[in-house]
C-alpha cells in the first residue's frame, strides 16, 4: 500500500442512479459517503447506455432521460458533500481484524471504511472491443472506445463502427468537423433514435458521409499510426479504406469482475441479500440495485431506491448500535431541513 487509506464511514461502489440515491439516504442519517465508479462520469447505465432515451417509471416524474435523471440526482445529493472517485475500478475488498473494510482500486487508491454499499449495477462496464490481433497497441492513440476530446478528430479521416445511439450520435457530430466520416455496421438495421437514423441516411444520400455494411476484418498500421482498414461485407467482398482514427461503439459488456473474489454469497452472478437490511453475507457490506438478488427481485430503478433507503437505516444502526435510529420526515423535520440547506416551512 503506497498511501495511507482514506478513512470513511461509508463507501459506495457504483455511481448509477441507485448509488447516487444511496448518498442521499445516508446523508439524511448524517453518514457521509465516498463514491467509486469505473466509468469517467456519474450515471452508470443511464449515462452510458441510454442518456437521451425517455424513462417513464420514476414516481412523480412523467418522463425524463437518463441524463436528466442523473443530473437531478446529483443536484439532490449536493448538500451531503459526497466525494467522487471516478475512472477507477474497485479491485479488492477485505475485512480487517477490527471489522472495517479495506477497499483498493485500480488507481492504487485505498479506503478503510466501516460500511460498504455495492451499487454496481450488473458489474463494471467494459467496452466490447474490436477482435483483431495486435489492435490493442493502437488504443487511445488512433482507436477509441470512448470520446473524451472530440476536437482531436477535426480534419481527420474518421471511421465509426456500431449501430446504436453512440455510433450515430458521434457520426452526426463529427460529419461537419472531420475530413470524412464513414459509418460501418454489420447490418443495415440500427438501434438508435429514429431521427438520428433518418439524418444519417440523409447525409449518406447527399454524400456528406458514407455507410458501409460489413465488418472490419484487417487493418494496416505503421509507426503506431493507423493507415488502412479492410471491410468485408456479407458476401465476402472486401474494400480497403484509408483511416486516421477509428471509433468503436459495440456497446458495453457488464462483468461481475473482482466482486466475485470478495467472499460474498453469489447466486446467478448476483449478490445474495436479506430484504430487511439488504446486507450481504458479510456484516457491514450491503448490496442495492441490479447487483443483488432475493425472492421477488425486480430490476427497476424504483426498487433500487427502496433498497437504498432500507440499507441506509441498517447501516446507521450498524454504525451506532447503542443509538436508536429515529425515522424523520423531510416534510417536517427541522434537523433534515438544516441538513438539506432549506428553511423549515411555517403553517398557518
UniProtKB/Swiss-Prot annotation:
Recorded GO MF terms: ferredoxin-NADP+ reductase activity; flavin adenine dinucleotide binding; NADP binding
Keyword Transport set for record: no
Cofactor note: Binds 1 FAD per subunit.
Disulphide connectivity of cysteines: none
Superkingdom classification of source: Bacteria
Enzymatic reactions: 2 reduced [2Fe-2S]-[ferredoxin] + NADP(+) + H(+) = 2 oxidized [2Fe-2S]-[ferredoxin] + NADPH
InterPro entries: FAD/NAD-bd_sf, FAD/NAD-binding_dom, Fd--NADP_Rdtase_type_2, Ferredoxin-NADP_redctase_2
Residues that coordinate or bind FAD: 37, 45, 50, 90, 125, 290, 331
EC number(s) stated in the UniProt entry for this protein: 1.18.1.2
Cofactor(s) in the UniProt record: FAD
One Pfam family per UniProt: Pyr_redox_2
This protein's UniProt keywords: FAD, Flavoprotein, NADP, Oxidoreductase
Keyword Protein transport: no
Subunit comment: Homodimer.
PANTHER family listed in its UniProt record: THIOREDOXIN REDUCTASE 1-RELATED-RELATED (PTHR48105)
Family under the similarity heading: Belongs to the ferredoxin--NADP reductase type 2 family.
The protein's name: Ferredoxin--NADP reductase
Originating organism: Polynucleobacter asymbioticus (strain DSM 18221 / CIP 109841 / QLW-P1DMWA-1) (Polynucleobacter necessarius subsp. asymbioticus)
Amino acid at each position: 500500500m503506497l498511501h495511507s487509506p482514506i478513512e470513511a464511514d461509508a463507501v459506495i461502489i457504483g455511481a448509477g442512479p441507485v448509488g447516487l440515491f444511496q448518498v442521499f439516504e445516508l446523508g439524511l442519517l448524517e453518514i457521509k459517503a465516498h463514491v467509486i465508479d469505473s466509468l469517467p462520469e456519474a450515471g452508470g447505465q443511464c449515462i452510458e447506455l441510454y442518456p437521451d432515451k425517455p424513462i417513464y417509471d420514476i414516481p412523480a416524474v412523467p418522463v425524463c432521460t437518463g441524463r436528466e435523471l442523473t443530473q437531478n440526482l446529483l443536484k439532490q445529493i449536493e448538500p451531503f458533500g459526497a466525494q467522487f472517485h471516478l475512472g477507477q475500478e474497485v479491485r479488492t475488498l477485505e475485512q480487517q481484524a477490527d471489522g472495517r473494510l479495506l477497499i483498493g482500486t485500480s488507481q492504487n487508491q485505498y479506503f478503510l471504511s466501516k460500511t460498504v454499499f455495492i451499487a454496481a449495477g450488473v458489474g463494471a462496464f467494459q467496452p466490447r472491443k474490436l477482435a483483431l490481433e495486435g489492435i490493442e497497441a493502437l488504443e487511445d492513440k488512433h482507436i477509441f472506445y470512448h470520446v473524451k476530446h472530440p476536437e482531436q478528430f477535426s480534419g481527420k479521416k474518421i471511421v465509426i463502427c456500431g449501430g446504436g445511439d453512440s455510433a450515430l450520435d458521434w457520426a452526426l457530430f463529427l460529419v461537419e468537423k472531420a475530413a470524412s466520416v464513414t459509418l460501418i455496421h454489420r447490418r443495415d438495421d440500427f438501434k438508435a433514435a429514429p431521427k438520428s437514423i433518418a439524418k444519417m441516411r440523409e447525409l449518406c444520400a447527399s454524400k456528406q458521409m458514407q455507410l458501409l455494411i460489413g465488418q472490419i476484418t484487417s487493418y494496416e498500421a505503421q509507426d503506431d499510426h493507423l493507415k488502412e482498414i479492410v471491410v468485408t461485407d456479407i458476401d465476402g467482398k472486401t474494400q480497403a479504406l484509408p483511416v486516421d482514427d477509428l471509433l468503436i461503439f459495440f456497446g458495453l459488456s457488464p462483468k461481475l469482475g473482482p466482486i466475485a473474489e470478495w467472499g460474498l454469497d453469489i447466486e446467478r452472478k448476483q449478490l445474495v441479500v436479506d430484504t430487511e437490511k439488504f446486507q450481504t453475507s458479510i456484516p457491514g457490506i450491503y448490496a442495492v440495485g441490479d447487483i443483488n438478488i432475493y425472492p421477488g427481485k425486480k430490476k427497476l430503478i424504483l426498487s433500487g431506491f427502496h433498497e437504498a433507503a432500507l440499507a441506509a437505516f441498517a447501516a446507521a444502526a450498524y454504525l451506532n448500535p447503542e443509538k436508536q435510529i429515529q425515522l424523520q420526515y423531510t416534510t417536517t423535520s427541522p434537523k433534515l431541513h438544516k441538513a438539506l440547506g432549506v428553511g423549515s416551512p411555517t403553517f398557518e
